[in-house]
């Protein structure tokens, strides 16, 4: 079954992969403030230390730059099943942040599907994708997925994607002409001292 899914376009893959979550939506049993909030909507749900370090750096950066805003975090494998609740809870003034790293493109279809879904679902919110590298395979599938990503990203005029290297920056500018692209080093470079990937505070699912 997984091999068959892997051959599908990312949008088809995601709808099948998360079919149960789309049908059986859940309400999050958490209390969030009425103040403006930062929603980290695709925190990694797996143990890769590099990606966990990036997630930690994102939290610390948000706390430092916007200390008065509450951070609410959902892991990437939980977003779809809480999507209806999120749509009813996230305010237009809230900021949505998405994971940095190297999962933008068609190499990691589950992550790309979740990212596209979030970006399209909140067209009026500022959405910030932290520094990413991009990869679309140099074949028909890669071209199709680049076009699908282009359409999804263009649906949100408040989207900003940060590229973490010059090659990715040029590629993103070419593939996503309607999206605001900026060049910025990997967010882990914003950390000082030793990174503890275990540290996590605030509200999360």
Q: What name fits each language-model region?
A:
Residues 2-156, 171-173, 188-189, 193-194, ...:
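Aromatic- and Gly/Pro-rich donor/ligand-binding loops
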Residues 50, 158-165:
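A short beta-strand/loop micro-motif in the catalytic core of glycosyltransferases
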Residues 169-187:
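Helix-loop-beta element that forms the nucleotide-linked donor phosphate-binding surface
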Residues 41, 159, 183:
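Metal-ion/cofactor- or nucleotide/acyl-coenzyme-handling active-site neighborhoods
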């Amino acid at each position: 079954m997984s091999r068959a899914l892997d051959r599908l376009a990312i949008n088809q893959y995601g709808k099948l992969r998360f079919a149960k979550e789309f049908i059986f939506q859940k309400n999050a049993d958490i209390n969030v403030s009425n103040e403006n909030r930062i929603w980290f909507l695709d925190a990694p749900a797996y143990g890769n230390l590099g990606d966990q370090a990036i997630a930690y750096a994102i939290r610390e950066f948000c706390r430092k730059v916007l200390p008065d805003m509450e951070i609410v975090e959902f892991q990437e494998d939980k977003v779809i099943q809480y999507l209806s609740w999120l749509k009813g809870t996230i305010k237009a003034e809230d900021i949505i942040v998405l994971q940095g790293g190297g999962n933008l493109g068609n190499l990691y279809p589950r992550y790309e599907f979740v990212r596209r879904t979030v970006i399209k679902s909140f067209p009026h919110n500022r959405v910030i994708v932290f520094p990413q590298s991009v990869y679309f395979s140099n074949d028909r599938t890669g071209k199709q997925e680049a076009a699908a990503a282009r359409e999804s990203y263009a649906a949100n005029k408040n989207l900003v994607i940060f590229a973490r290297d010059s090659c990715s920056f040029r590629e993103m500018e070419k593939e996503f002409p309607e999206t605001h692209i900026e060049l910025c080093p990997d967010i882990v470079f914003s950390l000082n001292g030793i990174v503890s990937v275990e540290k996590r505070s605030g509200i999360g699912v």
